[in-house]
Design a protein with these regions (language model features):
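Charged, compositionally biased N-terminal leader segments and the immediate start
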Residues: 1-4, 183, 188, 195
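TRNA-binding/sensing appendages of the translation machinery
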Residues: 1-91, 95, 103, 151, ...
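Positively charged, Gly/Ser-enriched RNA/tRNA-binding surfaces
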Residues: 19-36, 45-46, 81-84, 92-106, ...
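Short Asp/Glu-rich motifs
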Residues: 50-51, 180, 202, 387
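Short, structured secondary-structure boundary patches
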Residues: 51-66, 190-194, 292-295, 396-402
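Short glycine/threonine-rich loop-to-helix capping motif typified by GTGT followed
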Residues: 54, 180-190, 283-290, 337
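Acidic, His- and aromatic-enriched active-site or binding-groove loops in soluble protein domains
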Residues: 58-74, 187-211
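Glycine-rich, mobile lid/loop segments that gate access to catalytic sites or pores
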Residues: 170-181
């Protein structure tokens, strides 16, 4: 029998789980203080729903569940691999929420402000920062088409990050419609815009020349590629410059409103910036998109955007929707590396008792000590020094004894 967890999945030791519980609790507390309500959905979704969810590259990372019994036999006989699975593990929480809302719309308030903190699964190639099973902490607003929904999500999410001790971050914001409008005005065909956007999204990593080379490899119009290269080279990738190439000024006005309002709410505690190359990988985003980044860490710690077409796939009627997700695993990992300590947490001690000690008396003393400490009751070992060393190594702050009033705190030795 193998003792190791599967690749890309993790066992958690008590100290890390305690920190995760605290962080998730603070995030939930912040979300709930803003009137958001928590729901839960199944981990498994219908494969047809998953396949039609426009999840970008995530659609290639779905853990699929084989059909069973006669249905599997019949599927094997077709010779079509797509017939083998009828359900799969969710790769994020947006598709399940959209299905949930469509099924329960008449029972829910409008707009619906919702929390989801749950596990999702992706068949990633395991590496640092890439797990196959991980937790997402999402808030979404369904039923509000105004840019105030984006402002509220940014405000609540950033307050959650601040409340768990996260500082020095930047909220980057863009609108896919403005970027697409600019690219179309340069001569890129509408059916190539998604591909162009994905390449443009990597500009901060590969530079302007890298973007030009990658678009050339895709055999896109040379004149359009050169127009984009000239625009980037001019150093004029400002919101006003990009918006000037977009046919609908209302889109740019909404983005300016969100940027200005979010910056006011930040009050200097974090930065808010327009990021012209920000796209986000999921194909279901339809408007504004946002990411939270920290200069000292690579990659985003939170991200989201507007997905006005997703619920309509179930209802046949468009429902405005926008969400923001905190990368829980990433945030926990960063705080662990920084040696984060839970504010105001009680110290953990062990109350040691002898073999002949009256056990109800042990529990009574433990109850009294719990006014000040988190107390575990343990039988005292034959080699007390060794036992105390093991307790300290396991994260205990000290030990108490039945025949002594004081608590022995290890750091004070």
């Amino acid at each position: 029998m193998k003792t190791q967890a599967l690749k890309g999945m993790r066992d958690l030791l008590p100290a890390e789980q305690t920190l995760r519980d605290y962080i998730q609790g603070k995030i939930l507390e912040t979300y709930r203080s803003a009137g958001f309500e928590r729901i839960s959905t199944p981990m498994l979704e219908d494969m047809e729903n998953l396949d039609k969810s426009e999840g970008g590259d995530n659609l290639n990372l779905i853990f699929k569940v084989l059909k069973r019994g006669d249905k599997l036999t019949a599927a094997l006989n077709t010779g079509d691999p797509k017939q083998l699975s009828d359900m799969g593990l969710r790769y994020d929480l947006t598709l399940p929420l959209s299905r949930y809302y469509a099924a329960n719309k008449d029972k829910l308030p409008n707009p619906f402000k919702v929390i989801q903190t749950d596990r999702v699964f992706r068949a990633e190639r395991p590496q640092k920062g890439r797990l196959r099973e991980f937790v997402q902490c999402d808030i979404d607003i369904l039923g509000d088409a105004s840019p105030n929904a984006e402002v509220e999500l940014i405000d609540v999410t950033t307050r959650a990050l601040l409340n768990i001790g996260f500082t020095g971050f930047t909220v980057n914001i863009n609108d896919r419609r403005i970027l697409r409008g600019m690219l179309e005005s340069m001569g890129f065909a509408a059916d190539t815009l998604d591909s162009v956007c994905i390449t443009f999204d990597t500009m901060d990593k590969i530079g302007a020349e890298g973007v030009k080379a990658e678009l050339t490899e895709k055999q896109l119009p040379e004149s359009a590629i050169q127009a984009l290269a000239d625009f980037i080279a001019a150093g004029d990738v400002t919101l006003d410059a990009v918006a000037a190439r977009c046919a609908d000024p209302a889109i740019a006005n909404d983005l300016k409103y969100v940027l200005a309002t979010a910056n006011t709410l930040a009050a200097g505690r974090y930065q808010v910036a327009y990021c012209p190359s920000l796209v986000r990988g999921q194909g279901y985003y339809t408007g504004m998109v946002f990411e939270v980044t920290c200069p000292q860490f690579s990659g985003a710690v939170a991200g989201g955007g507007r997905y006005d077409n997703m619920v309509g796939k179930f209802l046949g009627v468009q429902v405005p929707a926008v969400g923001f997700s905190i990368g829980f695993e990433r945030v926990c990992g960063i705080l662990l590396e920084q040696g984060y300590q839970i504010p105001g947490a009680k110290q953990k001690i062990a109350l040691l008792y002898g073999k002949d000690t009256d056990f109800p008396a042990v529990l009574s003393k433990a109850a009294a000590l719990r006014e000040q400490y988190n107390v575990t009751v343990l039988p005292q070992g034959k080699k007390l020094g060794k036992q105390l060393g093991q307790l300290e190594a396991a994260g205990f702050a000290g030990a108490a004894f039945m025949d002594k009033d004081e608590v022995k705190i290890f750091a004070q030795q």
